[in-house]
């Protein structure tokens, strides 16, 4: 009985799920991250499903994966399974560094339309609604494209030795900036503050904005037997 009770306590405290989770809004706490399945737009698919799981937590690093098949509405994102950092919200001007690393692989059958991207949101107050969204696309598979007012990049910029095309467009009342890598990056290491510094200098981005959300994951449009495996991910806001 004693060993049984100990096993229950361990199971309750263990931050990593033993199995994949497939429900639309399921999540799993993993160290200083929350791993979301986040099938926010699944109803646009004619068929499909997606499951996500945590593989390992080691210090400030997490390994996780997500698997899916989605059909229909090839211009519509179906989900954004991601690892979200839990952090204290700060104004951009008061942040010293936002170091991050992500190493991943992607497999699929047939044709895939998807991206792999960081997603960061800011607001004029720590608890306010989203005013700006900054996306950093490491990969754009099958012609996936970002939100854009014109369909054309407004600039090409090199940050941390990686080349990105910058797009701008509205998503409701939120202004979206998307840095799309010109070549697929599967092993990424950067200070994300450099992207904000660029926007402050060239796009009149207000440094008084609070960083409220920092996530990294994948947005599938369509795909069959697809799987993204993140072997190592870390992020911090200093």
Swiss-Prot record:
Glycans are attached at residues 171, 187. It is found in: Secreted. Changing residue 40 to A: Affects the binding to host GIP2 and relieves GIP2 inhibition of XEG1-induced sugar elevation. The gene is XLP1. Gene3D superfamilies: 2.60.120.180. Keywords: Carbohydrate metabolism, Glycoprotein, Glycosidase, Hydrolase, Polysaccharide degradation, Secreted, Signal, Virulence. Interacts with host apoplastic glucanase inhibitor GIP2. This is Inactive glycoside hydrolase XLP1. Belongs to the glycosyl hydrolase 12 (cellulase H) family. It comes from Phytophthora nicotianae (strain INRA-310) (Phytophthora parasitica). Transmembrane segments: none annotated.
């Amino acid at each position: 009985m004693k060993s049984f009770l100990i096993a229950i306590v361990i199971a309750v405290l263990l931050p990593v799920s033993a199995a994949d989770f497939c429900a639309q809004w399921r999540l799993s706490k993993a160290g200083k991250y929350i791993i979301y399945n986040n099938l926010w737009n699944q109803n646009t698919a004619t068929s499909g499903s997606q499951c996500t799981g945590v593989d390992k937590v080691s210090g400030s690093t997490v390994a996780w994966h997500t698997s899916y098949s989605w059909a229909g509405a090839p211009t519509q994102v179906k989900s954004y399974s991601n690892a979200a950092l839990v952090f204290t919200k700060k104004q951009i001007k008061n942040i010293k560094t936002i170091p991050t690393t992500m190493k991943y692989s992607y497999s699929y059958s047939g044709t895939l339309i998807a991206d792999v991207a960081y997603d960061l949101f800011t607001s004029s107050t720590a608890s306010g609604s989203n005013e700006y969204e900054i996306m950093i696309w490491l990969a754009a598979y099958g012609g996936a494209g970002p939100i854009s007012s014109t369909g054309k990049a407004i600039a090409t910029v090199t940050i941390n030795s990686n080349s990105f095309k910058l797009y701008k467009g509205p998503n409701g009342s939120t202004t979206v900036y998307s840095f799309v890598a010109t070549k697929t990056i599967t092993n990424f290491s950067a200070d994300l503050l450099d992207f904000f510094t660029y926007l402050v200098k060239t796009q009149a981005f207000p440094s008084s904005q609070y960083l409220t959300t920092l996530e990294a994951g994948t947005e599938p449009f369509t795909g069959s037997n697809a799987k993204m495996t993140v072997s190592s991910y870390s992020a911090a806001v200093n």
